[in-house]
Amino acid sequence: MALSLSSVADVIARISTARDVAFGSYFLPEGPMRDALVGAARSGAHVAVTLQADPYRNPHGRRDNREAARLLTAAGAEVSLLRSARAPFHLKAAVCDGTAYLDDRNWTARGPEMVIADDDPSDVSIVRDAVREARPAADATIALRKDEALRREVLLVEAAGDAPVVVETERVRDSPLTAALRARARGGAPTTLVVGRTRHHSRAERRALVALARDGVVIREGGTNQKLALAGGAAWIGSGNATGAGGRSARQVEWGLVTRDAALVGAVRTALERDVASTRARD
């Protein structure tokens, strides 16, 4: 199988039958995924769950993770709540027996998200280590640390030539990725950025958006908070925002991969076409 499209529903179903489950997320609210993990632990499966103890500016996520830890521990699961100062963890991944699953959002099932299944033993091994031990790593297929995941996205953009490039992110700041987008646009290559809508962009985000627009990048606000890039016949999919990876965030546990698989590239193209069409141009 190697890489293939999956879904949150598929992962929930797999958790219910797996004997060994390693699961990681930025936060885990009440819902079908939490219920599936609790049920698997109660049924005797080995379940190990890793969550960020203190999601950034997200008190609801902090409470959700504490409650999830309480319920999962009571059901017999192993739970790790990681403090961001020591182990920044933004990964959304699961390993069920011999298959790894990677999600670009937080297993919400409330809207579009991209879930990738991977049964390559090398990939499965490093994903399992990233989930269970918060160990950032990379192989030829997957990067599991933010700096390397975003570096691969930058390389995709830089290698696109005159082909149209579309990138979607929830948040954005000045970084090598925005520099690559600006350079393309200055040279006349069609370049679009879809960025999540918010009431209050940070000063750094406003500065990045102004610079991108000034150099000719088409900015669309809205989308679905996915993390995607499309450049010709190749695509990048991941969990990391286009905010750069300096300092502590360089080793943040994330994921990102570049693919030319026709089904995956087609899914990314469909998602980006949907989000470009449903968003508004930034004033």
Task: Please provide the spans of the model-predicted regions.
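Acidic/polar loop patches that form or flank catalytic/metal-binding clefts of enzymes
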Residues: V166-V167
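Charge-patterned, long linear interaction tracts outside catalytic cores
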Residues: A271-D283
